[in-house]
């Protein structure tokens, strides 16, 4: 069975390998299919046509003027856009003319109608882009084809193709019909209302300016768009008229739409998108807006001031008048938290004069965002104001920008992360932390660093950012951030102590990002620091920084302190002083990312269950400010009525509108890491259904600001996929920009005049997850987000493709910085309002004015980011990279018309043409856009839900990159385009009504345009056929030259470091790729066939696997013949390896084929380049005289039709241009020769391709043979399987025999339960080993019993002996005491008394009346005994006067020899001590010493006897000789007569001579102790004397035991009767002896004998 299982496992592995092979085939098939599609889209040489006369006229005129600015400017807008013709309807002019274009051109650029651009019906839209001229058609490839190529190479891996010039041309008849049809429906140039700006001088630094009259746009009743009106469109005038991006105040450039226009889009005029910012614009030092040669895919110039794209009083859906509900901006007169009306502190984005709510007019107190180009230097640039007209950045350097970031403004991330913010704030300005002075604020944060921060070091940065952190909002790390953050540290304190924070937190402002998210801010303000602005003076910062308190928890580390507190607000609870539960503004333990204590994961602002009375305004319904039990990464408790998440009365720059019912500022159950937690997954910043008017602008219906249940990665989540940033159904102007450090809602690098379009529905300002880090909202087509003719330098962030960001056809000089490659900024021919940015997740740039409540792309919906229940039918194309009309990375040089017929669709060109008049937002997929799903945005008909009906259109989606197949499921929602996985085709489907409307309206307009064009060309060709033909050729040559020059520029930029030959080879290789032979398609079919065969083989293998698994289950008890099966499977392994090898060879062959194909035309390319270079000079000279030749040719025809006033007085004389005819003829001949060379080259290439085809066929044959071999192996496997089945039958028989044996065993086997029971009761050997045998135990017990009995007997005998001896000792002691205390004491006292009496008689005291006041000797007083009335001689009471220094005795000399006479030494030592302690003269001392010595001698003998007795009987406490010596020494020292002087016996000698020999003679060498040094203290302190008196000491009793006693009383020393008897007892005198060791007591004295013992000793000595 084990072998069988192994074989089955191997079979599964084999199936997996087959699956992998199948995937490889499928991938190869997709790639080949992609190549096939591209080949099918490559037009043939026969498609090259001539240009129309009308286009030729305009082209020559524009070309003449453009040539004056230099040949380089010819490439201004067609750069990287393929070989667009200079004069063809599809070719964009090399440079935009400064002359007013004809009305046909203006309308063509706005209409978007091409000859064949109406797939399934197209008649233009109802928007200004009802038709786009053929010139605009070529602008599409020029703006997108090249711009998308870099991304194509980087992301999609699709080869970058440059379309040939033939790709740009359409048939001549189609051009005529298209133009005639269009122009017939529009007013002529001379019929335009309003003044017309005539030819304006064009500055050389403005080659890309787009001419536009002041009335090029007007409103038509039958169209919901912008059309030529009397409106003064200063943004459409040549750039030379005004400084770049500067709109004259006299002109109503507040917005492109004129007043009373109900539209939300701008007219896509002819604009060269590839150089939105002219290369030579004065002041082009964009301060880092974009580095030269940097691929700033969507960087938009900032200098222009887009007020909001509407005029005051206009009901612009995206810009409402004053007092209206400016959903996303402000309402006049309200405390706009971030966006305020004019006349007040414009912290936000508002117009001062017109309540443009977020867009401000110049000359007002624009604290927020003021027009960079309209704000004079003298004005108070308190906002993002440009001090001069020439604004290289927001503010001119050196200008005093007091309020670039207005104090207290909601500057969350004034500079967006990763964006190249040239000068969000100008250097040199007093930016208090915004910028570094004198520095090029290339990003206003350090380039290359994730400096979502605001400023550079070197300024008084007020600590704007955290160094080294993810500065989503403020400054460069490691710099001198004096205030906001300590530079180079993990922000222990948000503000450095002692630093002057002039404006870190302006009073009354809401510094959302005062503390950087994720930063370590132990305290928003460090206590003791000079927090001038952290808590602004005059602001009631009760909670921001408690006065005198350590605000270490005001902003806890790891928390997102977007704005700890709002200055000017009574922050009673932000860090509530005197509130215990506000220790960190939020108690730790809760998930408070906002204002919490350090160490706790404070994802939310407060701890769940804590009533944060002050975090929101006290008195408000702050249930808990954070819902308990949830991960409150946000500020408020979901479901709570947050009338003031922040204080209602405070200037909450948009955090929460005061008085607004913030029931769910944070969606319940969502991950609220912070109100706007950067880098976090804000599933729902706001609770669904809550009226979040304050979270974004007041007055905005922010029902949830985030869709409930949607993955709201963050209200302003940087770098996250913010697809559903806002709640469906709510007018979410786009609170923030996702995809970057959106600490604030201000678009980095630009004056966010329209960051939130008033009343517009830009669903998130920037769709979450979109590449556009810029201001453009992916979900809405912000036509007027960047006004035409202005310099919104930062409107589009780098790396972002904003197709509809700028108005096509409008002059956005700075919309894109020079060198920036806007991959999706180009406008398309048709309705540009529906154009979408190219980068991913620009899903459906719907016009801002559309009522797009929650409309999001289907992909967003699939990811849970779209509003549930919202009809998002056509908000976005159904696939990932729906940012623009074309998928990034594809070759989109120009959309190819479906066919001439409006209702037909070319089978090989699955793309959409321009929509009808009612389809304002239709997007046009190009056939070359493999991998792009497109949807027609029928804003009012079939595309917008709720307008006219459902309608969708999506195209083939091949190579959709970045798309999760699991998320590309067909949507079952009504109106949502079905999403397909990569490699699948999405069918085109629309509602019949929408198609009919498109057909009817499109054909109507198209016929007019075409008829007018045909008439114009017919008139000219009839009169001047040669000239017409010549100019046709000239236009084509110009197109070829321009394309080739553009391609060479591309090569110079992209192939830097290579030789010219390599560059040319690369260019020609791409050109050759367009002519891949059709045989490759057959090869692709063959590969598909092989793939199908692989599928069939896979099915067979799966059947075999099922058979094996089924039989394996039946063979549970069988043994398989593993050897044979392994052999068969080994053969399969070898086969699989061979197949893989063949596949590898196939890949290599394909790579070789590609390389050969690229190198096939290298020789021809050199010659072609040489010829084109020769043509260059001819074309330049031809252009100089082209206008003259034209006027000469046309003069005879127009003489009778032109009025006298209409004749050009400056017309050139015909004779002046005669010399040009020869050159023209030479040019024609050269052109014919060049055409012949191209044809010959085309003929020669198929032969080489045939060879490559044969090689590919051989490779395919090998693959097929390999597959056949696999089939053979499968047959072998079938045979093996049959063998296995036979074996199975045999094993089945064996199993039957086994069953019989089992039955027999069942009868004869032992009972298992019985065995288990026996085993259980069986003794355990290991347990027995630990037990003791009974015999051993008994023997040990008996032995112990015997030993105990012996011990008892011994103890009893000893106890009897001890008792006898004790009794004897007691008897003897009693007897001795009687003898000692009676007779000897009596006799001694009697003798003493007699002696004293005798002395008194012999020497009575003499008293003199007037003697000295003091005497040396103590006086004696006469006293009588109370009992016997005997006279007594006692010394006078009082302190004894010491006569010698008191101090411890010096150590005695000790010999190494043992003592022999112990008692003698004891007496000597103490007698010496006694001699110094007496107050009597030396003679008296001698007598006293003799008496005392006798007593001590007897006492010592008694002690020795006691010691011997105790040693013999083993008393409890043995009195050893050492103890006895110490006791004797202590007794002597403790005697009262010796208290006067300490022991000085070591160096004192007796005056009485002593005899030699006797008991006092030493038997060992004795040396007197000489005082080697003085004692340390001669006089003992009074404390020591008192302690000596009252210390409790041990007393040695006569019984040998030691008792407790005190040393208070001592018997007086006994003196002899007279000094004469001293000699009789010399033997009793003490002798010096060796000093003994110190005593054991703490004070140096051991316990003394009791009085009775001392007296007894004295008596004994007398005896």
UniProtKB/Swiss-Prot annotation:
Its main location: nucleus. The keyword Cell division does not apply. One of its GO terms (biological process) is cell projection assembly. Interacts with AKAP3, ODF2 and TSSK4. Interacts with AKAP4. Keywords: Cell projection, Cilium, Coiled coil, Cytoplasm, Disease variant, Flagellum, Membrane, Nucleus. It is linked to Spermatogenic failure 35: An autosomal recessive infertility disorder caused by spermatogenesis defects that result in multiple abnormalities of sperm flagellum and severely impaired spermatozoa motility. Expressed in the sperm. This is Glutamine-rich protein 2. Residues 84-103, 131-150, 1639-1663 have a biased composition (Polar residues). Has an essential role in the formation of sperm flagella and flagellar structure maintainance. It acts as a suppressor of ubiquitination and degradation of proteins involved in flagellar development and motility. InterPro entries: DUF4795. Residues 1623-1636 have a biased composition (Basic residues). Changing residue 1112 to E: In SPGF35; uncertain significance. Residues 1085-1160, 1286-1325 form a coiled coil. It is found in: Nucleus membrane; Nucleus; Cytoplasm; Cell projection, Cilium, Flagellum. Pfam families: DUF4795. GO terms for cellular component: cytoplasm; nuclear membrane; sperm flagellum.
